[in-house]
Amino acid sequence: MSDDDQELGITESKSHNTGEWYAEVVQKAGLADYGPEGMSGFIVTRPRAYAVWERLQGFLDAKFKDTGVQNAYFPLFIPESYLEREKDIVEGFDPEVAWVTEAGNKELEERLAVRPTSESIITPYISQWVRSHRDLPLRVNQWCSVVRWEATETKPFFRTKEFLWQEGHTAHATHEGAWEETMTRLDQYASVYEDLLAMPVLKGQKPDHDKFPGAETTTTVEALMPDGKSVQAGTSHHLGQSFAEAFDITFSDEDEEERIAHTTSWGLSWRALGALIMTHSDEQGLVLPPGVAPEQVVVVPIWQEDTKDEVLEYAEGVADDLDDAGIRVELDDRDGRNPGFKFNEHELNGVPLRIEIGPHEVEDGELTLVHRPDGESVVEDREGVVATVQDHFDEVYAKLYATAEETLDGAVREADDRADILGTLGQHGGYVTAPWCGDEACEEPIKEPMAAEIVMVPFEDDDPLAEADHGETCAICDDDAERTAYFAKSY
């Protein structure tokens, strides 16, 4: 193996050393670098990772706009007095808030919070914009960064002090309208993972003790990582009337009676990139589904000097046809790099589909297509290359989804008591479902020894334990069970 091949290769094991493997993939695939010395918790997002984020952003933004959402932008800084108007926000985020206290050499009259979330700066403006029931529903979203000064170890795209996300905020005339909004956004988040990123997810709600500060209900999509930990992959909050009361969002109804609005907020961050990388990638490097890959297909011509001209001409024609069809294609016709090096490099970078073209393909009017996830090689006719490539994109997506779905299906296990929960989590990881009384105190006997928690409870319609007279008792305290709890370690 050459020095270049050694430099390209992934040396850590995904199954035995997941954290180090993940960090190596992120850096060697050119996705991110760590921030400057003295700024732990910050990363530099490199163009290839940002391109994936842009694809995700475009997919989700289109769904938002199709359902009545308009984009806006609000200040990065939030006056302390604004935060204090919603006490639950203050209590929930205060340990993580970064404050600006000086501008130039002058001390500010009021501290400014660097945006940890924007309810406190957006809601006052919604209050100004809403006067009548005719102004409702009102829906705004912003794509931005937020800062939360967490002390945990930096893990690119999973745990950083600054991260990219979108946050949507809406106001509605009724409780039912706000709940429908909450579920619409949750379904759209699930679609991002399942339809774009080829990742099955679980949908449910957070237990009351873990819901968003000030929320009536927090709904969540949870994704399972290969190390058996869960990722909170997106949340949608039914805020009830707490924020509307704090910030005076009122409207006159059809009878000219003054009413308090019902609000929601919902957000998805670049944690989705971390979950994507960790779920599909392998010990050859990054693996991406075609929908978000910066380069969807790479064409690699393979020639000897006496066949170079005809092979390159054939390969250029294939690449041009794909490019004209809107497929993101790269023609790798570099001199000085042998085909094996090119194959390894594009595998490391996660290109979903490779087309190999040598003298035999030219002579026979064919193409050799290789799938990134499993290395499957298929010979196809040159004619109709665009439709052929699109079909293979579908196959690559299906392979990725099927593998992830099989992993998730096999990682949900049942338990009836504390010892069983701890033993199953310790041996297998993943999700352990157990009957739960609804008391936060019954999470502690699992959290303390195992660092696991209740990451989700199913919605009432999906949970047999939400019905009366089921006869189940809590796995921890033996009181009557009210819900099914999903216990897991989490990022």
Swiss-Prot record:
GO biological process terms held by the UniProt record: prolyl-tRNA aminoacylation
E.C. number(s) listed in UniProt: 6.1.1.15
InterPro entries found in the cross-reference section: aa-tRNA-synt_IIb (IPR002314), aa-tRNA-synth_II (IPR006195), aa-tRNA-synth_II/BPL/LPL (IPR045864), Anticodon-bd (IPR004154), Anticodon-bd_dom_sf (IPR036621), Pro-tRNA-ligase_IIa (IPR002316), Pro-tRNA-ligase_IIa_arc-type (IPR004499), Pro-tRNA_ligase_II_C (IPR016061)
Keywords: Aminoacyl-tRNA synthetase, ATP-binding, Cytoplasm, Ligase, Nucleotide-binding, Protein biosynthesis
PROSITE patterns reported for this sequence: AA_TRNA_LIGASE_II (PS50862)
GO cellular component: aminoacyl-tRNA synthetase multienzyme complex; cytoplasm
Predominant cellular place of this UniProt entry's protein: cytoplasm
UniProt-listed HAMAP family: Pro_tRNA_synth_type3
Gene Ontology molecular function: ATP binding; proline-tRNA ligase activity
Family listed: Belongs to the class-II aminoacyl-tRNA synthetase family. ProS type 3 subfamily.
Swiss-Prot/TrEMBL catalytic activity: tRNA(Pro) + L-proline + ATP = L-prolyl-tRNA(Pro) + AMP + diphosphate
Assembly and interaction partners: Homodimer.
Protein name: Proline--tRNA ligase
Localization terms from the record: Cytoplasm
This protein's domain notes: Consists of three domains: the N-terminal catalytic domain, the anticodon-binding domain and the C-terminal extension.
Gene: proS
Functional note: Catalyzes the attachment of proline to tRNA(Pro) in a two-step reaction: proline is first activated by ATP to form Pro-AMP and then transferred to the acceptor end of tRNA(Pro).
CDD domains: ProRS_anticodon_zinc, ProRS_core_arch_euk
Matches recorded under Pfam families: HGTP_anticodon (PF03129), ProRS-C_1 (PF09180), tRNA-synt_2b (PF00587)
